[in-house]
Amino acid sequence: MRVRVRLFASLREAAGVPEASLELPPGATAEGAWGRLVGDFPALAPRRASLAAAVNRRYAAFDTALQDGDEVVFIPPVSGG
């Protein structure tokens, strides 16, 4: 199955791309998508502990199963004032 991953803020800067298309096995989870993304963009690896995930514009746990065509967004912490 294929999913689209969108990257924002520090994740986009670390990967050097705004999005990626990933081929994943059936039953893959958001965690699996993150692992595949880190395989393609190793600079992302240290950022996992502070991320949230969203699937199809809804916050989702990292163990959420993905479907073909899903859009996955990994969200870094937001700060500012």
Predicted regions and their residues:
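Ubiquitin-like/PB1-type beta-grasp interaction modules and other compact soluble beta-rich domains
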Residues: M1-G80
